[in-house]
A protein has these predicted regions:
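Extracytoplasmic
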Residues: 1-211
């Protein structure tokens, strides 16, 4: 997700190969203090931190992640699509009990955005009964049927990618990784779109997670 914010690279924050503590936990200021990322807005109740473990070779994509706690509301300017057409917007999360429940909004006017559906519980991984998940088998046709069932529930397994553990993010050992399909719709290549992530919980300790 940090690739959406050029300042993270130009200011030597992202992918910094340094194990010094101050470079591993970088706090992002609120907009009212200093608008650090041009492509991101956050409310005053958002406490955001960038966790950089590039020097430790974390299993996260590019060995980093972004987290926020508080009664957060974060709006992100999305990059353009290459051509107009029907696209899916997906949100990948490593689910655990520390995560929160998020309402997503999407639109081309960040002052008037529509919810993408019901709030998403980030504590729920692939094994939850609502997803339709089953572990991959040797039968590729059956695996495709399971994938289709999950897509009907707006879920996907982790990506078919190599992890530090030497396997795929689709493996049963990685079933806490889930991709949520937030929407499928026509996207105009000539428009700018935004995604808003807003906590719907009273708790200010549950996490927003972006990898």
């Amino acid at each position: 997700s940090m690739s959406l914010f050029p300042e993270a690279m130009s200011n030597d924050i992202r992918k910094r190969d340094d194990t010094d503590y101050r470079y591993q936990f970088v706090h992002i200021p609120k907009n009212s203090v200093y608008h650090y990322f041009e492509n991101m807005d956050m409310n005053d109740e958002t406490n955001m931190v960038y966790l950089n473990s590039y020097g430790y070779d974390w299993c996260n994509l590019q060995a980093d992640e972004v987290k926020a706690v508080g009664r957060y509301e974060v709006t992100i300017k999305l990059p353009p699509v290459p051509r107009s057409g029907t696209y899916e917007l997906r949100y990948r999360v490593l689910a655990n009990g520390d995560r929160g429940v998020v309402q997503f909004y999407f639109g081309d006017n960040k002052n008037f955005m529509q919810p993408t559906g019901i709030p998403v519980d980030l504590t729920i991984g692939c094994r939850h009964q609502s997803t339709g998940w089953e572990d991959d088998t040797e039968d590729l046709d059956y695996n495709a049927e399971v994938d289709k069932r999950m897509r009907n529930n707006n879920r996907m397994k982790g990506a078919e990618a190599i992890a530090n553990s030497g396997g795929s993010a689709r493996k049963s050992s990685n079933s806490h990784i889930v991709r949520h399909i937030l929407l499928r719709q026509h996207i105009d290549a000539n428009k700018t779109y935004y995604l808003r992530l807003k906590s719907v919980l009273d708790s200010d300790r549950k996490e927003l997670y972006m990898d």
